[in-house]
Amino acid sequence: MRTYTPKPGDVQRQWHVIDATDVVLGRLASQTATLLRGKHKPTFAPHVDTGDFVIIINAEKVALTGSKLQKKRAYRHSGYPGGLKSTSYAELLEKNPTRAVEKAIKGMLPKNKLAAQQLSKLKVYAGAEHPHQAQQPKPYEFTQVAQ
Protein backbone atom coordinates (compact mmCIF):
# COMPACT_ATOMS: atom_id res chain seq x y z
CA MET A 1 0.00 0.00 0.00
CA ARG A 2 1.34 3.42 -0.92
CA THR A 3 1.73 6.30 1.49
CA TYR A 4 -0.95 8.95 1.15
CA THR A 5 0.33 12.46 0.43
CA PRO A 6 -2.22 15.27 0.63
CA LYS A 7 -2.39 17.55 -2.39
CA PRO A 8 -2.86 21.29 -1.80
CA GLY A 9 -6.20 21.17 -3.65
CA ASP A 10 -7.51 18.30 -1.50
CA VAL A 11 -7.16 20.16 1.80
CA GLN A 12 -10.44 21.09 3.52
CA ARG A 13 -9.84 24.22 5.60
CA GLN A 14 -12.07 25.15 8.52
CA TRP A 15 -12.25 28.35 10.54
CA HIS A 16 -11.82 28.22 14.33
CA VAL A 17 -12.40 31.07 16.77
CA ILE A 18 -10.56 31.02 20.11
CA ASP A 19 -11.45 33.24 23.05
CA ALA A 20 -8.13 34.00 24.81
CA THR A 21 -9.75 35.32 28.00
CA ASP A 22 -7.82 33.89 31.00
CA VAL A 23 -6.03 31.30 28.84
CA VAL A 24 -2.31 30.83 29.57
CA LEU A 25 -0.27 32.23 26.67
CA GLY A 26 1.88 29.12 26.15
CA ARG A 27 -1.11 26.77 26.16
CA LEU A 28 -2.91 29.07 23.71
CA ALA A 29 0.15 29.20 21.43
CA SER A 30 0.74 25.44 21.35
CA GLN A 31 -2.91 24.59 20.61
CA THR A 32 -3.08 27.30 17.94
CA ALA A 33 0.15 26.10 16.32
CA THR A 34 -1.34 22.59 16.13
CA LEU A 35 -4.44 23.93 14.36
CA LEU A 36 -2.39 26.11 11.98
CA ARG A 37 -0.13 23.20 10.99
CA GLY A 38 -3.02 20.74 10.59
CA LYS A 39 -1.63 18.19 13.05
CA HIS A 40 -5.15 17.53 14.35
CA LYS A 41 -6.16 16.08 10.96
CA PRO A 42 -5.58 12.50 9.81
CA THR A 43 -4.22 13.84 6.50
CA PHE A 44 -1.32 15.73 8.15
CA ALA A 45 1.98 15.81 6.29
CA PRO A 46 4.91 17.93 7.50
CA HIS A 47 5.77 19.18 4.01
CA VAL A 48 2.23 20.28 2.97
CA ASP A 49 0.20 23.09 4.52
CA THR A 50 -2.93 21.25 5.69
CA GLY A 51 -3.80 23.66 8.52
CA ASP A 52 -6.95 25.57 9.31
CA PHE A 53 -7.67 29.27 9.76
CA VAL A 54 -7.60 30.46 13.38
CA ILE A 55 -9.16 33.64 14.78
CA ILE A 56 -8.09 34.68 18.28
CA ILE A 57 -10.24 37.24 20.07
CA ASN A 58 -9.67 39.02 23.41
CA ALA A 59 -5.88 38.84 23.07
CA GLU A 60 -5.59 41.64 25.63
CA LYS A 61 -7.01 39.31 28.32
CA VAL A 62 -4.47 36.49 27.87
CA ALA A 63 -2.83 35.20 31.09
CA LEU A 64 0.82 34.75 31.97
CA THR A 65 1.71 32.60 34.98
CA GLY A 66 4.07 33.49 37.80
CA SER A 67 6.06 36.71 37.46
CA LYS A 68 6.45 36.44 33.69
CA LEU A 69 4.43 39.61 33.18
CA GLN A 70 7.29 41.68 34.62
CA LYS A 71 10.33 39.42 34.08
CA LYS A 72 9.80 37.92 30.61
CA ARG A 73 11.17 40.14 27.85
CA ALA A 74 10.35 40.43 24.16
CA TYR A 75 13.35 41.28 21.95
CA ARG A 76 13.64 42.89 18.55
CA HIS A 77 16.63 44.13 16.56
CA SER A 78 16.86 47.00 14.09
CA GLY A 79 19.69 45.39 12.11
CA TYR A 80 22.20 48.04 13.13
CA PRO A 81 25.00 47.65 15.71
CA GLY A 82 23.58 48.31 19.16
CA GLY A 83 20.04 48.07 17.80
CA LEU A 84 18.73 45.44 20.22
CA LYS A 85 15.57 46.61 21.99
CA SER A 86 13.73 44.76 24.74
CA THR A 87 10.28 45.21 26.24
CA SER A 88 8.62 43.49 29.18
CA TYR A 89 5.49 41.51 28.42
CA ALA A 90 3.49 43.84 30.68
CA GLU A 91 4.39 46.76 28.40
CA LEU A 92 3.88 44.68 25.25
CA LEU A 93 0.42 43.46 26.31
CA GLU A 94 -0.57 47.01 27.19
CA LYS A 95 0.77 48.57 23.98
CA ASN A 96 0.11 45.84 21.39
CA PRO A 97 -1.50 42.63 22.75
CA THR A 98 -1.88 41.09 19.29
CA ARG A 99 1.90 41.16 18.76
CA ALA A 100 2.53 39.30 22.04
CA VAL A 101 0.19 36.47 20.99
CA GLU A 102 1.52 36.34 17.41
CA LYS A 103 5.13 36.21 18.67
CA ALA A 104 4.36 33.26 20.97
CA ILE A 105 2.60 31.34 18.19
CA LYS A 106 5.31 32.09 15.61
CA GLY A 107 7.89 30.61 17.98
CA MET A 108 5.99 27.30 18.00
CA LEU A 109 5.77 26.95 14.22
CA PRO A 110 8.56 25.25 12.25
CA LYS A 111 11.41 27.44 11.05
CA ASN A 112 10.95 26.85 7.31
CA LYS A 113 9.15 28.22 4.25
CA LEU A 114 5.79 26.79 5.35
CA ALA A 115 5.80 28.84 8.56
CA ALA A 116 4.98 32.13 6.78
CA GLN A 117 2.17 30.43 4.88
CA GLN A 118 0.77 28.91 8.08
CA LEU A 119 1.13 32.17 10.02
CA SER A 120 -0.85 34.03 7.36
CA LYS A 121 -3.89 31.93 8.37
CA LEU A 122 -3.75 33.40 11.88
CA LYS A 123 -5.96 36.40 12.69
CA VAL A 124 -5.51 38.00 16.13
CA TYR A 125 -7.76 40.72 17.55
CA ALA A 126 -7.38 42.55 20.88
CA GLY A 127 -11.14 42.90 21.47
CA ALA A 128 -14.14 40.59 21.20
CA GLU A 129 -15.14 41.67 17.67
CA HIS A 130 -13.74 40.23 14.42
CA PRO A 131 -14.69 40.76 10.75
CA HIS A 132 -14.84 37.05 9.85
CA GLN A 133 -18.48 36.21 10.66
CA ALA A 134 -19.14 35.29 7.01
CA GLN A 135 -16.73 32.33 7.31
CA GLN A 136 -18.86 30.88 10.14
CA PRO A 137 -15.97 29.99 12.48
CA LYS A 138 -16.48 27.19 14.99
CA PRO A 139 -15.61 27.98 18.63
CA TYR A 140 -12.57 26.09 19.94
CA GLU A 141 -12.67 25.34 23.67
CA PHE A 142 -9.74 24.85 26.04
CA THR A 143 -10.04 22.29 28.80
CA GLN A 144 -8.05 24.35 31.30
CA VAL A 145 -7.78 28.10 31.83
CA ALA A 146 -5.70 30.13 34.29
CA GLN A 147 -6.74 30.04 37.93
UniProtKB/Swiss-Prot annotation:
Annotated keywords: Ribonucleoprotein, Ribosomal protein
Signal peptide: none
GO cellular component term, pick one: cytosolic large ribosomal subunit
Gene Ontology biological-process entries: negative regulation of translation; translation
InterPro entries: Ribosomal_uL13 (IPR005822), Ribosomal_uL13_bac-type (IPR005823), Ribosomal_uL13_sf (IPR036899)
Gene3D superfamilies: Ribosomal protein L13
Source domain of life: Bacteria
Pfam families listed in its UniProt record: Ribosomal_L13
GO molecular function terms listed in the Swiss-Prot or TrEMBL record: mRNA binding; structural constituent of ribosome
HAMAP family reported in the protein's UniProt record: Ribosomal_uL13
Function text: This protein is one of the early assembly proteins of the 50S ribosomal subunit, although it is not seen to bind rRNA by itself. It is important during the early stages of 50S assembly.
Record family assignment: Belongs to the universal ribosomal protein uL13 family.
Oligomeric form and interacting partners: Part of the 50S ribosomal subunit.
Protein's recorded name: Large ribosomal subunit protein uL13
Protein source organism: Kocuria rhizophila (strain ATCC 9341 / DSM 348 / NBRC 103217 / DC2201)
Classification lineage: Bacteria, Bacillati, Actinomycetota, Actinomycetes, Micrococcales
Encoding gene per record: rplM
